Amino acid sequence: MANVIVIGAQWGDEGKGKITDLLSRSADVVVRYQGGVNAGHTIVVKGQTFKLHLIPSGILYPNTDCIIGCGTVIDPQILIAEIDQLKELNISTDHLLISETAHVTMPYHRLIDQASEERRGSYKIGTTGRGIGPTYADKSERTGIRVLDLMDPDGLREQLEWTINYKNVILEKLYNLPPLDPQEVIEQYLGYAERLRPHVVDTSLKISDAIQRRRNILFEGAQGTLLDLDHGTYPYVTSSNPVAGGACVGTGVGPTMIDRVIGVSKAYTTRVGEGPFPTELDGELGELLCDRGAEFGTTTGRKRRCGWFDAVIGRYAVRINGMDCMALTKLDVLDELEEIQVCVAYDIDGQRSEHFPTSSRQFARCRPIYKTLPGWKVSTTECRTLEDLPQQALDYLKFLAELMEVPIAIVSLGASRDQTIIVEDPIHGPKRALLHPDGTPATLLSA
């Protein structure tokens, strides 16, 4: 039995969907613990592409229970559309469970999100405009609508009549937007409630029961460590906690129940939206990474900013999440490069630093200090073992593992399930490297 958290170790979009899909083969339960439709994951199976935002990656396995936890925020319209999409493809969603205490994104959340971002002007943070921040804000203000409220028609009518009238004042007076019709919204969401009712349960009890029965549970995060509300590049962050600690809060599982944390990183770095990005590449090289990596957001279609691998934020992610091992994705994107650079430290106002600064203003002044490695100039997409990889690619992987001080358990070389090298069992294999007295790692990727 193993209870495993899969987290993003960069700014999101690391390929968590594929890695979670791979690990779901040996999982009995897959749980999404935070975020909403502001994040998407893409899974490619036998040439067929599945793009999901709320439903966990394990949905493609009929014997795997899939749970949307209490730490998420749910847009019922989009969730129902995902359910219908899967049914059209003859994929059952009978094993999908939704937390009754998850909060619900309402139409006024989306309107306020978009209007607020527009009003920020040059201070915009790059929100997706899907209403995620305002939904979490209402949760904190204790004025939010929860899934269990949708299941109570009389209570929902009373709650929404007051809430929508209150939000209409904000929409009209602050943002000069037309008001919402309370009755129209109420009827719309009562309809959503009936569609979702068969899936709604106390998911914390379901997860607790699975733990007691010693089932394998996979906790799936959205976004990434550097987008965490408390530990990311604030204010250019999301409104929840994608870090490993968020899995406990967002599901109702005690921290002593977690056995392992797997971090997912690209072989380079991407970021979407605003905020500092020390290793960002402009010009032809950045465009090459973007094109080869198909770096366009699943949710918004926005072009992602691309740059070299940043080991400073990588080590930070290892520390903040307590990562035991790493899955490295999109190694194949680097196949055409003569040389590859890795950021090993920052120059901050003339001082060398190997630590991630907590201030975004200071982070914006960071200049990368690079180590240059030779490229391999051959395709790796057909490699299925470490022995198949060119020596320069092996050297690159070993260098990253040494910098991160965690073993690399999985190497992904394309979008399909089979384009993967399993270096070590990511569930039961080596954990975070122990250090010798001189500070050098005791166990790392060996080739």
Curated annotation (Swiss-Prot):
Binding site for GTP: 12-18, 40-42, 304, 330-332, 412-414
One GO process term, biological-process aspect: IMP metabolic process
This protein's UniProt keywords: Cytoplasm, GTP-binding, Ligase, Magnesium, Metal-binding, Nucleotide-binding, Purine biosynthesis
Position of the signal peptide: none
Main location: cytoplasm
Alphabetical list of InterPro entries matching this protein: Adenylosuccin_syn_GTP-bd, Adenylosuccin_syn_Lys_AS, Adenylosuccinate_synth_dom1, Adenylosuccinate_synth_dom2, Adenylosuccinate_synth_dom3, Adenylosuccinate_synthetase, P-loop_NTPase
The protein's Enzyme Commission number: 6.3.4.4
Catalytic center residues: 13 (proton acceptor), 41 (proton donor)
Keyword S-adenosyl-L-methionine: no
GO cellular component: cytoplasm
GO MF term list: adenylosuccinate synthase activity; GTP binding; magnesium ion binding
Record: residues binding Mg(2+): 13, 40
Cofactor(s) demanded: Mg(2+)
Pathway listed: Purine metabolism; AMP biosynthesis via de novo pathway; AMP from IMP: step 1/2
Oligomeric form and interacting partners: Homodimer.
Entry similarity comment: Belongs to the adenylosuccinate synthetase family.
Function: Plays an important role in the de novo pathway of purine nucleotide biosynthesis. Catalyzes the first committed step in the biosynthesis of AMP from IMP.
Protein name, entry field: Adenylosuccinate synthetase
Provenance organism: Nostoc punctiforme (strain ATCC 29133 / PCC 73102)
Organism phylogeny: Bacteria, Bacillati, Cyanobacteriota, Cyanophyceae, Nostocales
